Amino acid sequence: YCDGYEVLTSYRNSKNYGDNWISAGYALWFIRESRYLNNARMLMNTSCAVSGTGFFFSRKVIESAGGWTFHLLTEDSEFSVHQILKGQKIGFCAGAILYDEQPVTFRQSWRQRMRWARGCLQVFRKYGVGLLKGMGRGSFSCYDMSMTVLPAFVLTVGLIVTYLVVATVTAVDGIPFWPCLIYILRALFGMYQTLFIIGLFTTVTEWDNIYTSTGKKIWYTFTFPLFMITYIPISVAALFTKVKWKPIEHHRADRKVLETAAGRSGK
């Protein structure tokens, strides 16, 4: 705030990384987002983006917006896009760490990520024209946010359409299905490899910020791509499903994680 930022977001960490592959998948993605998206944006002197609830804004910001008027399914993304279109630059404070609690069941995860997927569509529907105009004026932040809220759907739908076309042509022409299946499996394996490299790099560089055992850090690096690949059916379902906001229950207060983090920061 003293550096002139009216909006700041934090380093989004998690207190239950080691619960299972689902909580670890969330946690690793958010750590990557903090270190390699928002921190990179700060180094480039462009706007960051709010993620989750660990953020700060001045009274001036909320008054200029007429109160908290952001009620789409992904209000954090909506708030970020709104501020960027108003010319506000969002900052990132790496020393302000939020210890979030992540879902641990696939049912909870499906419901939450379905909301996020649908919410991103809502944000682009409401602010897409403004973002495109900003891109036309040379705004990197508008381009950045467009790539943040839209690509998952574009890539997913494109992938599904491609597979359906290939499968249809195969069936009509009487071509054996096995080559098509091999193509699909190769594509999925390529996705797995890319996501594994992303997860591995983040795990290695942010090792001391991940609060679980060494074995779990290593194991959940291998399950991270599987967690991310489940976004494909979720994204497709979000296109055709009416999604409502439902709370995700939180019950934990992992004092051990917080005490360990406090001890490390005091070194």
Stretch-by-stretch model annotation:
Residues 1-72, 114, 121, 125:
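Long helical/loop segments within the catalytic core of UDP-sugar-dependent glycosyltransferases
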Residues 27, 31, 104-108, 216:
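Transmembrane helical bundle of ABC transporter permease
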Residues 45, 80-99:
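Catalytic donor-sugar/metal-binding loop of nucleotide-sugar-dependent glycosyltransferases
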Residues 79-80, 109:
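Short, hydrophobic alpha-helical packing/hinge segments within bilobed ligand-binding/sensory domains
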Residues 101-118, 249-252:
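Nucleotide-sugar-dependent glycosyltransferase catalytic core
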Residues 110-149, 161:
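Active-site-adjacent helix/loop segment of glycosyltransferases
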Residues 129-145, 169-267:
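Juxtamembrane C-terminal module of membrane proteins
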Residues 157-173:
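Hydrophobic, aromatic-rich transmembrane alpha-helices
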